[in-house]
From Swiss-Prot:
One Pfam family this sequence matches: MMR_HSR1
Homology family: Belongs to the TRAFAC class TrmE-Era-EngA-EngB-Septin-like GTPase superfamily. TrmE GTPase family.
Protein's name according to its UniProt entry: tRNA modification GTPase MnmE
Residues that coordinate or bind Mg(2+): S230, T251
Function: Exhibits a very high intrinsic GTPase hydrolysis rate. Involved in the addition of a carboxymethylaminomethyl (cmnm) group at the wobble position (U34) of certain tRNAs, forming tRNA-cmnm(5)s(2)U34.
Subunit relationships: Homodimer. Heterotetramer of two MnmE and two MnmG subunits.
Organism (species): Serratia proteamaculans (strain 568)
Gene3D superfamilies: P-loop containing nucleotide triphosphate hydrolases, Probable tRNA modification gtpase trme, domain 1, tRNA modification GTPase MnmE domain 2
Sites where the protein binds (6S)-5-formyl-5,6,7,8-tetrahydrofolate: R23, E80, K120, K454
PROSITE patterns xref list: G_TRME
SS bond list: none
Record's keyword annotation contains Magnesium: yes
Top-rank lineage group of the source organism: Bacteria
Length: 454
């Protein structure tokens, strides 16, 4: 669709409410004001007046706000009509606006898209609007606001600027090879490159934490039947989310609970006990359990402490460990400490964390919560933090890889042309985050996930 049309959409959620808002953006916004209000309101002042139909009858009365472009959210002329929040009233107002020439309903996210296209905000800031609306915790909301205010974008621009300066030196070394000082071999370019790589690593670490805050950490509870997996799910969730009995194989399907630990979102998944299936239903449940394990960020390997004194995972269940995806982090949870009399606490066993607790009594659960936070590098103090999406992490990873390859070309062969190309590609990958180098297809996918009125 054309981005020069005048668009309209309801900016408040559907349903009944005290206030309902229509947002209009585009060259025809002033025509809407003249038609419904009889005048053009004073810019950026609230004006209380009737909203009229084509015959001059009052449809509603409320507040009109007029923002002439380019000093508006979208960079275009914008009119907001704030009336009563009844569905019928809003529908009448919407039909009235759409009856005027050149008006159409906005696509999802089109207001934010126009703001991006008119350089009112970059792509990372536009995405932060949707993240702010979807925030599931106070910390996520604060980090989304930081992103909206440019915290993430500023870090990216600093990296791009540093790469620009570095490219200048490299291009100079290529263009003037006969100069007395060889910039490629005197160590200065390598030192600058190392500095950029260190800064990029810092941003990547913050972005991973921002992604964790946005997406949540997927933790799968796995183990043999009757190890206490469902009891642990209930203890972490703080409610009876799963049925708990002494009958082996009670849990036959995947159970999911979404919880927060000091603002960190976690997706806790209880799975069927892993063993040789006794019937088709149990076989399907075990297959689903392994599917969840393979997609997990961390596995809590539940062990019934009354059945073994072993603490080494490979000794407890070698077949289970052999099937786990490579490098998938696991935490061994020795359950039923209230029965075995084991001392509660956490230790390290051959690179794996081991926690002794009682899911039934709740003893040791707080220790597990702290461990889950620490294992993902999460801190409750993220005042300057920002949210990040998977595409951001991918772009940062691509940029880092290009810098690694560029350094290899510099150190091994002083290949200036190849280094310059890797620097350019790294810069392009970073610019995709803010939207300076982004395909139209990607823009369409990003903004289509927004609300209609945003």
């Amino acid at each position: 669709m054309s981005t020069t049309d005048t668009i309209v959409a309801q900016a408040t959620p559907p349903g009944r409410g005290g206030v309902g808002i229509l947002r209009i953006s585009g060259r025809g916004a002033k025509d809407v004001a003249q038609a419904l209000l009889g005048k053009l309101p004073k810019p950026r002042y609230a004006d209380y007046l009737p909203f009229r139909d084509a015959a001059g009858a009052t449809l509603d009365q409320g507040i009109a706000l007029w923002f002439p472009g380019p000093n508006s959210f979208t960079g275009e002329d914008v009119l907001e009509l704030q009336g009563h929040g009844g569905p019928v009233i809003l529908d009448l107002l919407l039909k009235r606006v759409l009856a005027l020439p050149g008006m159409r309903i906005a696509r999802p996210g089109e207001f934010s898209e126009r703001a991006f296209l008119n350089d009112k905000l970059d792509l990372a800031q536009a995405e932060a609007i949707a993240d702010l609306i979807d925030a599931s915790s106070e910390q996520a909301a604060r980090s989304a606001m930081n992103s909206l205010q440019g915290a993430f974008s500023t870090r990216i621009h600093q990296l791009v600027e540093a790469l620009t300066h570095l490219r200048i030196y490299v291009e100079a070394a290529i263009d003037f090879p006969d100069e007395e000082i060889d910039f490629l071999s005197d160590g200065k370019i390598e030192a600058q490159l190392n500095g950029v790589m260190a800064d990029l690593d810092s941003v990547r670490a913050e972005a991973r934490q921002g992604s964790l805050l946005r997406e949540g950490m997927k933790v799968v509870i796995a183990g043999r039947p009757n190890a206490g997996k469902s009891s642990l799910l209930n203890a972490l969730a703080g409610r009876e989310a799963a049925i708990v009995t002494d009958i082996a194989g009670t849990t036959r399907d995947v159970l999911r609970e979404h919880i927060h630990i000091d603002g960190m979102p976690l997706h806790i998944i209880d799975t069927a006990g892993l063993r040789e299936a006794s019937d088709e239903v149990e076989r399907i449940g075990i297959e689903r359990a392994w599917n969840e394990i393979e997609q997990a960020d961390r596995v809590l390997f539940m062990v019934d402490g009354t059945t073994t004194a072993a603490t080494e995972p490979a000794e407890i269940w070698p077949e289970f460990m052999a099937r786990l995806p490579h490098r998938l982090p696991i935490t061994v949870v020795r359950n039923k400490a209230d029965i075995t009399g084991e001392t509660l606490g956490m230790t390290e066993v051959n690179g794996h964390s081991l926690i002794r607790l009682s899911a039934r009594t709740g003893e040791g659960i707080d220790l597990l919560r702290d461990h889950l936070k620490q294992s993902m590098g999460f801190t409750s103090n993220m005042e300057g933090g920002f949210l990040a999406r998977r595409r951001h992490l991918q772009a940062l990873e691509q940029a880092a890889q290009h810098l690694v390859e560029g350094k290899e070309q510099l150190v091994s062969a002083y290949a200036g042309e190849l280094l310059a190309e890797e620097l350019r590609l790294a810069q392009q990958a970073l610019s995709e985050i803010t939207g300076e180098f982004t395909s139209d297809d990607l823009l369409g996918r990003i903004f289509s996930s927004f609300c209609i009125g945003k």
